[in-house]
Amino acid sequence: MKAIFYLLLFLFCFSILFVSCNFNNDSDDTTEIDCPAEIASRAFRFAELYKDSDTVYELGGQAPVRSAIAIDCSGLVVMCYKYAMVDTKYSLLVSDMTAAYMCETASSHVALEQMRQGDLIFMGEADSSNVSHIALFDRLENGNVYFIDSTKKDDISGVTCRYYAASDSRFKSFGVMKIQY
């Protein structure tokens, strides 16, 4: 009789444990959304900090704001959004992304006229459709698109505020960062 009691108690405890376990490996407990304007704006403010810190360009760089700063274009965007989401329920879809990945997978495409400060600008060579560069949108003014990016050219190395004409063929797409909570 005692053995049956312990067997039933064991089966009861085991069934409680079994039912409480989540065996559905396909479920994802996160929700993916377009980044709220407040987070995009905060990301832009961090880009301004990088710019004001005389940050230089370095391919593959993702230096935090407080170190000897060297960063590339996608690293700038990733780090600014990471900082913007500190103390919020939000996070990036993945922790490191290229400009092309952000364009293809981690953003919702919008028209230039719908862009908010801190949203994403995808760029590439004028004669190519490939995305090879990314920047944070500042504003559209007098037919020019103003942005902050990290680049290395003959006359630029680092994070700067620049602009191109809105019709410039280097612009490939515009987007809102997708985030999760």
Where are these regions (language model features)?
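Aromatic- and glycine-rich peptidoglycan recognition patches
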Residues: C35-E38, S107-V110, D127, V131-Y181
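Positively charged n-region of N-terminal signal peptides that target proteins for export
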Residues: M1-Y6
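N-terminal capping segments
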Residues: D26-S91
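Structural motif
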Residues: G118-D119
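Bacterial N-terminal signal peptides
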Residues: L8-I16
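Short, structured beta-strand/loop micro-motifs enriched in basic residues and often containing a Trp
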Residues: M97-A106
